[in-house]
From Swiss-Prot:
Organism expressing this protein natively: Triticum aestivum (Wheat)
Protein name listed in UniProt: Two pore calcium channel protein 1
Domain (EF-hand): residue spans on this chain: 335-370, 376-411
Residue ranges of coiled coil: none
GO molecular function annotations of the record: calcium ion binding; voltage-gated calcium channel activity
Topology, Extracellular side: 104-140, 198-204, 248-258, 274-296, 468-480, 532-540, 604-627, 643-663
Annotated function: Functions as a voltage-gated inward-rectifying Ca(2+) channel (VDCC) across the plasma membrane that mediates sucrose-induced Ca(2+) influx in autotrophically grown leaf cells. Acts as the major ROS-responsive Ca(2+) channel and is the possible target of Al-dependent inhibition. Plays a regulatory role in defense responses.
Cytoplasmic topology ranges: 1-82, 162-176, 318-446, 502-510, 559-582, 685-742
Location(s), subcellular: Membrane
Keywords recorded for this protein, A-Z: Calcium, Calcium channel, Calcium transport, Glycoprotein, Ion channel, Ion transport, Membrane, Plant defense, Repeat, Transmembrane, Transmembrane helix, Transport, Voltage-gated channel
Amino acid sequence: MSEAEAPLITEEAAERGLASSGSRRLSDGAGGQGSRKYRRRSDALAYGDRYQKAAALVDLAEDGVGIPEDVLNDTRFGRAMSFYFVYLRLDWLWSLNLFALILLNFLEKPLWCRKDALQAYDQRDLYFLGQLPYFSKTESLIYEGLTLVILVMDIFCPLSYEGLNIFWRSTTNKLKIVLLFILACDILVFAFSSQPFRLAPYIRVVFLIMTIRELRMCAITLAGLIGTYLNVLALSLLFLLFASWLAYVTFEDTPQGKTIFSSYGVTLYQMFVLFTTSNNPDVWVHAYKIPRWYSLFFIVYVLLGVYFLTNLILAVIYDSFKEQFAKQLVQVDSIRKNILQKAFDLIDTNNRGYLDREQCISLLNELNKYRSLPKTSREDFELIFAELDRSGDFKVTSEEFADLCNTIAIKFQKEPPPSYLEKFPFYHSPLCGRLKSFVRSRMFEYIIVFVLLINLVAVIIETTLDIENSSSQETWQEVEFFLGWIYVAEMALKIFSLGFGAYWMEGQNKFDFVLTWTIFIGETLTFAFPSKLPFLSNGEWIRYLLLGRVLRLTRILLQVQRFRAFVATFFTLMSSLMPYLGIVFCVLCMYCSIGLQIFGGIVYAGNPTLEETDLFNNDYLLFNFNDYPSGMVTLFNLLVMGNWQVWMESYWQLTGTSWSLIYFVSFYLISILLLLNLIVAFVLEAFFAEMELEKGEEVDIQNPTSGGIKKRRSMRVRSKGTMVDILLHHMLSNELDGSQNS
């Protein structure tokens, strides 16, 4: 660090009661001897020696925490990083506020019924509204005001560590400020007047996309392929126009033409719906009744449109998608490389361009605080150094240093925080040692699996007796209550043996923790107050949670060789798919807000036009756009393409204008033809890529030669240490190489 930072660090160290600067500094080649130990990365970056700072930066880089490059090169780097970590520690608040913003869309009173409060509260059945409560105008303003204040803090907090110049260079920050201003104005207008239109529901979703990095990357990627998508859409439109004209001319004087293809516009609409196969074969039944060979026209149309053109569109779009997505990954990798280069420069104080053995060993020693590296001797550290020194000249260059960090991220887990019980002597007694060893053993796992199997049998029997209204049901409910205590004991033993930090690091344990406490508290209240709490006295909801607990049996599949790859691939794919599913959710939110503002309130009991629609005939009245929850469910039905033309044609009749078709057609083009097809293609390629990685691991295990290790390491050299990143980099290896070469 530069000398300009010394007074600042000394002042803050005195305030926090830290050791003097003499204990913080490390002499060259000392490898951390005599320096103060920091368990937190923020303290290490602000007050640590150069090895401690470098180790904290390496850990940040491998965790995917992106620090602006200008902040890395700032002379007041230590102070900036202390503010940066304060901002990161408040991430739970920023995330909770984003959730609150989206939740507000579901709890807001629909704009179309604000003039008459009775419509929303006392006549829910008349308008087929949902069961969620609505905020009053005052409650909405208070809620929006609180979320706005937190949003302002979230947006402007980066000023503390970036500074005004760096902050204002970011296009994302500028856009956030503009949207924040528009949102504040919208709230003010809403406070003093009742307008039928608001921008706030849309801006909330945009903030969600811009704040979550994965969603932002997906949105930028999709924006980059708009040009390609419009080109293939133009080709599809030409095909549809020509096929519709051919159908209109061919069936002009037939019953098909007189009933279904009565005009070119109607023919175009029907052929578009047939392109989605939603009205097949209803649309050409009349033509099929006269000469059967007329069916050839529609068969050829479906084959060309659905099985050729649609797949061609998917292939072109997915190829462009991979190129755009590779560009985003290159940017993420660039941030990681910049952080690692900063760590390299901190150690290479003499600007030699390489690190020697002593420096690498000192860094590995400091990394023990963040990664569960082997607690071994200096000789073992030298073996790690020798493995990474590919040139054999006892010098590690910046490129080899990146391989070092990548290997650490892949091979070693995060070091969990020590248990709070470590300070008590009894925790280190022989009896506690045997108990902890038993909890960590496979025998303990087998016992829990056996209890789960008993639980499954008990749930099945209790459910069967409930259906038969048998009095023996109460006995099995008591059995389930007893099993609940066993799960609580299991959770307590694991936390005691591992420590809560190590216990919470595993996703399976998080699932068990939440589920166990929810079921246990619910069962306890049900047995303690069977009549005072009507909601809890109904055991149905607890039974569903008990069935959820049986999902832990999927752990057994991981022990079977033939199933392990498939189960592991499933969980990896679920993690990698979350950003894309999040984008689909955001699109649904946008279209739901639009649907509420243009279709809200037109579906109600007693509407004479409604009774003439297929919406009424099919008993789809609950699937409407009268409030946000109902609109989201309706859009989900449209997303799965289940009779989606029913809503399109019904709202065409209800509004009396064909302009309403734009809403449904655009939703199909964006959500289904683009997003869902991309997700399907992504899942297919990701599955094959993950299977290749699994086979590669098996080969390396069976043939642990240096060549096999080198091949495996080179396959993951770009990754950030997580399975999702490894998978993405393997999938897009060709595109990434092309982006870097260009």
